[in-house]
Every structure is written in structure tokens, then in C-alpha cells.
């Protein structure tokens, strides 16, 4: 992000706002770690907004404020969380923390699937749009992961059936996109990473993390049983 500012892509005022409000993001990561007992994965600030189109010919687009991305490095798979600069700059505390928590759930689900080699056709959508903001059925039940009641409220409030924050979207449109600040456009139907089987085989997951994910799965099972009775 500092490089983008140095190269003139981000105005001084916007850069200062991002730097100043970055503490809200750090506080969110710390909060998620305390509420789950699990370390947050590697994350970075993307100095752009990411927009996604259903297909190349579509005029409709969605804004992706953060993404959980599998990356192949040294013939191994790593999962990183990309946090967009406009979310840091313009998001309210509750919104930022809810989005970070939601991405954290994606991270845990991906680790679970990788550990079980449960990846359909050896492919993962690298923007995970259908998962990130609409398909919550593939995620762990937040109550099985977090013990922070306020954080859980933020998640359920922001992600009832798919993330929408009209005030934040309006701010990003007016203060970022219309001002021609850095924007990455991706098409949902072309943004797929193929993950070779040997890469999955080479990927070693921390056994302590796997134990914690197994405990989460047990909690999910107990919560489902409670719903049945």
C-alpha cells in the first residue's frame, strides 16, 4: 500500500486515512483470535477495490471488500486473506470486524477441505464470490467458532443471507471508484485456480490447527443436534 502511495496511485489524504484507520483492522484480527483461540492467517492490505462481474458481458458488478485466496508457493498451498484499502478507510468498526470474521470462517473451511483432500475437481475459485457473500451453507456455524457475543451479532446482522452494506458501497462508489482510484475488475467465470494433487499432497497443516478445527466440527454437530430436538 505504501508503494502505491509512493507511486502516486493513492492521494496523500486517502493514504493517511487508511494508515490511521488500520488500527481498527488490527483490533478486529486480535478480537477474532481471542474469540476463536485460533491464529488469524497471513493477511495484507490490497491498495485497490475489487469488483466482480458475473461474466465478461455483464454490466452488473459486486464489490468484494475482502477475499480468502489460496496461493501456490514453493509447490505448496497457502491461504491468505486480502483486505481492500477502501474497507479499511471507510468501513465502520462492526462492518470491518464482521467481514474479517466471515473471511476467517472461509479460511477454516478451506483448511478443513484441504486436510481431507476435499476439493472438487482440484479447483477452488480464487475470489470465492459465491461463498464470500452469498453461500454461507459451506461455512462453519459462527457460534461454533467465536465466543464473542457482540462479534456474533455483527456477523449475523451483516451476513443474514449475503453481505450488503449500502452506506459503505455508496461511499466506495463516490469516494473511490468515481475518483478513478485503483480498481481491480475480475470476472467470476474466469477467475479459477487449478490446484494440482501433488501441491495438495505437499501442503502440511499445523496439527494443532487441525485439532482446533476438529473441536469446531464437534461443536457444529452438537449445535445441529440441539436444533433437531
Which positions does each model-derived feature cover?
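Short amphipathic alpha-helical segments
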Residues: 17-24, 92-96, 100
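Zn2+-dependent metallopeptidase catalytic core
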Residues: 18-41
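Active-site recognition of the HExxH zinc-binding catalytic motif
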Residues: 98-111
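Pan-zinc metallopeptidase signature
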Residues: 153-229
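Long, charged, glycine-rich C-terminal linkers/tails
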Residues: 42-50
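Post-HExxH zinc-binding segment in Zn-dependent metallohydrolases
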Residues: 112-159
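Acidic/histidine-rich, surface-exposed loop or edge segments in extracytoplasmic proteins
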Residues: 3-13
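Active-site scaffold of zinc-dependent metalloenzymes
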Residues: 56-94, 111
Amino acid at each position: 500500500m505504501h508503494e502505491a502511495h509512493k507511486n502516486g496511485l493513492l492521494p496523500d489524504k486517502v493514504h493517511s486515512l487508511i494508515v490511521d484507520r488500520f488500527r481498527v483492522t488490527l483490533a478486529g484480527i486480535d478480537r477474532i483470535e481471542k474469540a476463536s483461540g485460533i491464529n488469524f492467517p497471513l493477511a495484507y492490505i490490497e491498495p485497490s477495490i475489487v469488483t466482480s462481474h458475473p461474466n465478461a458481458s455483464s454490466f452488473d458488478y459486486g464489490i468484494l471488500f475482502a477475499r480468502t485466496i489460496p496461493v501456490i508457493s514453493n509447490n505448496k498451498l497457502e491461504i491468505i486473506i486480502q483486505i481492500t484499502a477502501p474497507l479499511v478507510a471507510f468501513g465502520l468498526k462492526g462492518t470491518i470486524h464482521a467481514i474479517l470474521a466471515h473471511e476467517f470462517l472461509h479460511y477454516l473451511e478451506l483448511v478443513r477441505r484441504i486436510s481431507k483432500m476435499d476439493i472438487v475437481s482440484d479447483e477452488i475459485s480464487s475470489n470465492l464470490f459465491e461463498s464470500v457473500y452469498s453461500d454461507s451453507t459451506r461455512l462453519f456455524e459462527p457460534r461454533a467458532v467465536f465466543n464473542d457475543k457482540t462479534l456474533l451479532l455483527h456477523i449475523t446482522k451483516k451476513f443474514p443471507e449475503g453481505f450488503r452494506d449500502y452506506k459503505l458501497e455508496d461511499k466506495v462508489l463516490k469516494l473511490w471508484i468515481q475518483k478513478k482510484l485503483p480498481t481491480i475488475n475480475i470476472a467470476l467465470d474466469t477467475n479459477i485456480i487449478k490446484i494440482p494433487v501433488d501441491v495438495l499432497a505437499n501442503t502440511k497443516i499445523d496439527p494443532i490447527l487441525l485439532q482446533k478445527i476438529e473441536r469446531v466440527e464437534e461443536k457444529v454437530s452438537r449445535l445441529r443436534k440441539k436444533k433437531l430436538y
